[in-house]
Amino acid sequence: MLLGDYFQNIQSTYKNFFFSGISFDSSQVKKNNIFFAIKGNKIDGNDFILSAISNGAKIVITEKKINGLKNGILFIHSNNIRKLLAEISFKINNKIPNNIIAVTGTNG
């Protein structure tokens, strides 16, 4: 898959950059995957970027102000990484799920 087919606002320099899949879990990253470094309430995915790269990630998407190619790894900045992950997942899978389940809660 090529970045230009899935990312609308990607620089033309990177449109032909190949990727094989996506992951937001560094331990599940495979060769040439995109790693989405998502910051959560307790765990920051940015802390696992090196692990994702050692597992084969060639592209890292992060909310940190990092952009461009560094040591063969393409870093892409996103202001809304969760939305981008959802959009790219939909484009790759090309289907709407039959069921959507949501869990909500309160603090008391």
What are the language-model segments listed below?
Residues 1-87, 91:
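N-terminal leader/targeting and accessory segments in enzymes
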Residues 90-108:
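Walker A (P-loop) phosphate-binding motif
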